[in-house]
Amino acid sequence: MNLPASIPVRTFISGCHILHRHHVLDAYGHLSVRNPERSDTFFMSRDLAPGLISSSVDLVEYFVHDASPVNPASPAGYIERFIHSEIYQKYPEVQSVVHSHASTVLPYTITGVNLRPCVHMSGFLGASVPNFDVAKFYKEDDKCDLLIRNKDLGAHLAECFSAPESDSESTRSVVLMRGHGFTAVGGSIPESVYRAIYTVENAKIQTVSMTLSAAAAKGDGPHSGIYFLPEHEIRGTKELTQRSVMRSWKLWVREVETGGLYTNLA
């Protein structure tokens, strides 16, 4: 695919590689970016493991309104591209989307335990992260396999990104998906990648903290539970990470460029 210079192909490919290197994506999951030249289309890779994407040939352009390929002769794409199209349709400020099946986050989608920000790098999670259950929206002819296979299911998922009226932001950064994974959004590829990575990191930290807290509760020493970020620290740390995301991004790009596994010909 011959793309205009304004399309961030190299950044997109680096983002896919970074997400794979950090175990946010494996053979499955995907990254997308809105077309900076026309907001009614977006780009994803063809049906390929993220770590193997290497050039613009691997990209497919889709219409936002129905997730159909702009070029009908495009190679096969991901089934769940409706996750991305419906988020772009509803939230014009969103420029990039990540969908992940990370195993460290999955327990928070099936246990009733809320994923909450507990470190300064994850204030973007907000006071609580909603958990979307696709089973509530199946129609009679839908495949009941948890995948977002059509526009209707994608639209229901997208609704979960609408923040409460009390929130200063109009869009949530992350939504969990019951038994499936999570989806993160951002105003750029680096921001959505950062949020996906630190969603996984926060889940790791919270899980270990809950284990230690449970052990402490059984002992003789003092026990005060887990200290999650209060509202004012959530706001402050979210602003902090929005300003500093490129520091992480530049390091991550260098790591995948020198890692040996990945190829970026863009």
UniProtKB/Swiss-Prot annotation:
Its EC number is 1.-.-.-. Keywords: Metal-binding, Oxidoreductase, Zinc. Binds 1 zinc ion per subunit. The active site is at residue 80. Pathway: Secondary metabolite biosynthesis. Pfam families: Aldolase_II (PF00596). Zn(2+) binds at residues 80, 99, 101, 180. Its cofactor is Zn(2+). GO terms for cellular component: cytoskeleton. GO terms for molecular function: actin filament binding; metal ion binding; oxidoreductase activity. Belongs to the aldolase class II family. Decarboxylase; part of the gene cluster that mediates the biosynthesis of the tropolone class of fungal maleic anhydrides. The pathway begins with the synthesis of 3-methylorcinaldehyde by the non-reducing polyketide synthase (PKS) tropA. 3-methylorcinaldehyde is the substrate for the FAD-dependent monooxygenase tropB to yield a dearomatized hydroxycyclohexadione. The 2-oxoglutarate-dependent dioxygenase tropC then performs the oxidative ring expansion to provide the first tropolone metabolite stipitaldehyde. This is Decarboxylase tropJ. The gene is tropJ.
